């Protein structure tokens, strides 16, 4: 699919003979904003005694859609190689389904939703091809610190009618991806595809029927974004 996209983009570039924003690469600094869609999830490790606790049969994950809003500041370290700072907000949602075997041998599924509003501070490096008229492709890699402003880590489970899955309020992740730059008449438009892989275990182990059957939760997200850059 990637090669089909590359072929179609190159065909687009060949049809458009006028060179837009011809002086764009002569400036070292660029600024813009980003609108994104995310599908977030967890990478989960079960507890070692998972099969023998609480009549629990299965735990399944359901990725949920969310969205991202970011600002962009880019500096050219050298031709076609840029460092970018992209502070912003990420609205993420995940659902974990727990299937239990009841005393009458019926199965019951209980769902727990985990919502987060992250304040993100990503820094990444972008390696771009040379321009083909008004088109270029690129790869990126970097890291990100995230602070969950909707964290429920301090909720008292003893006072809650419905127990929740608690996660810590900060995360570190590695971002990898790529995209395409389109140089339009007045600004540069970019389409970007990126995966975000969390490093730390986010789970707070508070010995509820849900948390004690899980040993690790690490964040995972796929992000598609549109960048407007001047």
Identify what each model region corresponds to.
Residues 169-230:
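Predominantly the C-terminal beta-signal and adjacent terminal strand-loop region
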Residues 13-16, 122-127, 178-179:
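Short, well-ordered amphipathic alpha-helices
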Residues 27-31, 63-67, 115-121, 135, ...:
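Residues that define the transmembrane beta-barrel architecture of outer-membrane proteins
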Residues 25-29, 37, 41-43, 72-152, ...:
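Gram-negative (and chloroplast) outer-membrane scaffold detector with strong preference
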Residues 12-65, 229:
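Short glycine/proline- and aromatic-enriched beta-strand/turn motifs that initiate or cap beta-hairpins
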Residues 45-60, 93-116, 149-167, 203-215:
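Flexible, solvent-exposed loop segments that connect beta-strands
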